[in-house]
Amino acid sequence: KPLGAYLEQQLGMKVEFTPVADYPAVVEALATDRLDLAWLGGFTFVQVRLKTGNAIPLVQREQDAQFTSKFITANPDVTSLADLKGKTFAFGSVSSTSGSLMPRYFMLQDGIKPESHFSRVGYSGAHDATAAWVQAGKVDGGVLNASVWDKLVASGKVDSNKVKVFATTPTYFDYNWTVRGTLDPALAEKIKAAFLALDPANPEHKAILDLQAASRFIETSPENYKGIEDAARAADLLK
């Protein structure tokens, strides 16, 4: 809500929030011009870009340029992925950049094929569900978005005495704000400028940034998402 009001003020036009059901729905809505601006995970952006050919990523949060995923376990004897050989493991949603795609890609680069390394691979459907599965002993290990992990620990939703991080992925680019390629370029520039102008020293701006878990926004470009596209191709997720 505060972000919508801020954009209305900066752009001098009505801004309407449209909820979407899931990742594929966002891809479809941007491709058919039903959405002008959307907050996308890295993999969803790659799908939108390939489907539309012209979607433009405008800005990302500072941390999205160096995003990571955390590997977690409740087993004190596990200190590496090698220790989970023959045990059970959970990813988040199949099409989640940080909960599935990038961790899988980094595992493959380390010579670990999840389906043969683990006795069973499950998909929890969400980052917090992965943490809950691990904490409840439903799986021996799991992987989730680093910022969600930090939030779960800070809010006490996960017991860090029981569940621990035993590995962190290399960094990659993740979330961004993307506009449809058919949007008026002058308006796209104004939207970008509005995000870049958000200043944490301004209390009103800080409230908007906090809701997005952002320190500030920085510019981004399609080239930044090449690594995710490569990972998606390696995982056979792009047809």
Residue ranges and their predicted role:
Residues 1-43:
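Extracytoplasmic small-molecule ligand-binding "clamshell" domains
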Residues 9, 80-88, 231-239:
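Immediate post-signal peptide segment of exported/extracytoplasmic ligand-binding proteins
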Residues 24-38, 51-52, 82, 126-147:
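Short helices/loops that flank or line small-molecule/ion binding pockets
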Residues 1-2, 174, 178-239:
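An extracytoplasmic/periplasmic, membrane-proximal ligand-sensing/linker region
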Residues 58-80, 177-180:
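Hydrophobic/proline-rich hinge and linker segments of small-molecule sensing/allosteric domains
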Residues 36-38, 46, 53-68:
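Short beta-strand-centered segments that line the small-molecule binding cleft or hinge
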Residues 77, 87-186:
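Pocket-lining segment of extracytoplasmic ligand-binding domains
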